[in-house]
Structures are given as C-alpha cells and as structure tokens.
C-alpha cells in the first residue's frame, strides 16, 4: 500500500446543527493534535438549499473520501522513500510460529449511534452489523470510514482508523512479547439489547480465537 505520509484531507463547511472544530496549526494547541503536522487539503462543502440532513452528511463524507482516493492514486507509481512491512499470518500459522507467546486480540469499538455518530466498514453502517474479525492491515488500508461529525476532538476520524496507534504498537510487539491474532470490530449501539448482543458476540469471537487477553478501545 502506498501512503502519502504527511498529507491529510479535511472536510469543512456547514453540517447538521453546529459542530464547530478548530485545528490549531501553530501555538500551544498544535502540540495536542496530529493534524497540525500535516499538509492539509481542505474541502469546503456548501449544501444546496433544502437538502435532507442524512443526504447532507453522506455527501460531505463521500466528498472527503473521493478527494482522498484521487490524491492517493497520485502515489500509485512513485518510488517509496521508506518501506514498512507488517506480517499478518493466519491464526493457525501464528500458533505454529509463536507457541509460547500470549495470544492477544484488539477489540475496536466503533461509534454507531445514528446521524453524525456513525462508522462504516466496507461501506456498511456498523449499526447493522454484528461483531466481526478484521485483519489488522485492513484498517490501515481504509476498511473503516468515520461518519462522526459531533463534538470536534473527541471522536475518531478516518485518519485515526488508518493510523491506529494501538494496532501499530501491537504490530511492534508481535513475535516479541505477544502473538497479535487480529482485530475484532464491534459497534456501540444505543439500545441495551443491541449492546448485550454485540458484547456476547465479541466475547464469543475472543473465545473462538483462543486468546489469552484482549485490548479494548472505546470511542
């Protein structure tokens, strides 16, 4: 996968309700955001009059995605300055390679509570999905797309999913102190019955993978 490291795409403009957010590119605030270190291409989206709110959110989300896709393709045929290799053996192969290391999974909880609080996996709204297993590199390649536009700075953007620090750290320890078996994605739905269903299914997948432990991150 070719990556234009140091580049970001930011969508801006009016959205449903007031959801202001500021990216400090200099000064004290810049120390607390990864985006201050990027060359950001800002896509300003102005809605047409009378557009339905769900259609508005989707249009802005897809505008950012298509822009990132277009820019990313510019790197398709260039020679990389640096190359990083991430090994993702199968569950069976991992047991053979690292029989004495603890088996660890990463449970990635994804926001899924309605308009402005949604996450999409391969285009599917996570509200409609049961927990499932992803290869860690799938998140790096863009499998998880954020639709969160509420409360700037306390939600995971698509950039965070592409550059998930938990996955990166687990890869660094893989084969040394632990056997990183994979990522289990689950949702964060509103109703109690949905929460219980997802929790039970996540626990079942962890048991099925035979993990010794799991790291859980909540959005």
PLM-predicted stretches and their roles:
Residues 1-213, 218-219:
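Metallocofactor- and cofactor-centric catalytic cores in central/energy metabolism, strongly enriched
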């Amino acid at each position: 996968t070719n990556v234009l490291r140091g580049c970001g795409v930011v969508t801006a403009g009016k959205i449903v309700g007031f959801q202001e957010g500021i990216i400090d590119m200099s000064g004290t605030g810049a120390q607390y955001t990864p985006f201050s270190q990027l060359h950001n291409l800002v896509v300003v989206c102005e809605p047409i009059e009378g557009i339905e709110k769900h259609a508005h959110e989707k249009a802005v989300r897809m505008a950012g995605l298509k822009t990132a896709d277009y820019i990313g393709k510019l790197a398709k045929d260039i020679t990389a300055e640096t190359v990083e290799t991430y090994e993702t053996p199968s569950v069976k192969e991992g047991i053979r390679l690292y029989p004495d290391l603890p088996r660890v999974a990463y449970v990635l909880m994804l926001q899924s509570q309605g308009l402005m609080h949604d996450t999409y996996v391969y285009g599917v709204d996570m509200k409609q999905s049961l927990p499932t297993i992803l290869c860690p590199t799938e998140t790096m390649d863009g499998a998880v797309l954020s639709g969160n536009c509420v409360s700037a700075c306390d939600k995971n953007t698509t950039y965070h999913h592409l550059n998930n620090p938990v996955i990166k750290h687990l890869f660094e320890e893989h084969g040394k102190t632990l056997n990183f078996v994979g990522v289990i994605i689950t949702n964060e739905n509103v109703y109690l019955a949905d929460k219980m269903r997802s929790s039970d299914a996540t626990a079942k997948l962890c048991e099925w993978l035979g993990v010794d432990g799991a790291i859980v991150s909540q959005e």
